[in-house]
């Protein structure tokens, strides 16, 4: 997901991976080599890297193939002999495509798993399959790690399990307060409004440094479709999990070298704690007191709202390289999913794009419109990017949801 900061090309955008011939090759490679050839080999130290790669591919592309269960059960059988990264890839793939059926095997591994992140991933699988497991899982965690409160991942796991049946019901504080607060700083801001159910796509809006939201020449609010769901759908504090809520820092506009992200200009974001807080704050701040400095970015009425701190907790847990980008991935991988045709990611925010499969040229792009709106909005080339869940409705965020919020704010200006 590393991206190179650069000015976008003025030439038509082209992605060879979007050609139908390349998409067909990728599908064949996943079918014949990633799964077929890997399963023909024993899972031993010599071939372990192939199983790890297969698990990563399962998490990203979510292919429908009955052989996947065979591969995952083989990984479970050999789990104690696997390297840490292969264990993580297996648990991520399992969480992605098999929400049930592996409970007894994972429960047997839980007591011996000494890696906090892997322990957390096992707990999350068991809690999702049966929410009644929550109390027992918390008790095991506290018994194993009495100082869990001091560990970034385990403390987030504890909060997540405690709030699993409550957070969706709690509405956020007044969103207008966020709009007014950002205006008071005179800092350009992108807001990505999401649902708690990240299967549902959200919408992004751009507020200039003058406090006004970007509109078209007819005065219509500009909104941009965006998915904040990772392939795994793991929580925000796990690597490759869903995009955390909270405040990211926009460092500018760049272009990626990743073929699946594609060449469309993206918004370069940094998180709390990423790269030693370098460049995160858009104003003078004391990074020796990061909690107080982050809190200052929130209106007073939002500082006790736990979801607004997800980005802080995720950064503290080691998450990095979350950006807002487009996609060249064949949307047919996700046919039938609520978020089709947008691609889930490794935790970034993804806008839909349409590439001509015959020429590889970009035909339509929400991502391009978003970056252009940010570029043209009043203010410098940097700013903040704020991700907020509005509620737990099982439907995408729609224009009417945001027009009500934004117009109420603008009437009060």
Say what each PLM segment does.
Residues 320, 340-353:
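Active-site nucleophilic cysteine motif
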Residues 1-5:
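Bacterial Sec-dependent N-terminal signal peptides
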Residues 105-109:
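A short acidic, amphipathic alpha-helical/loop segment
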Residues 6-62, 67-72, 80-88, 92-99, ...:
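Cell wall/extracellular polymer interaction/catalysis modules
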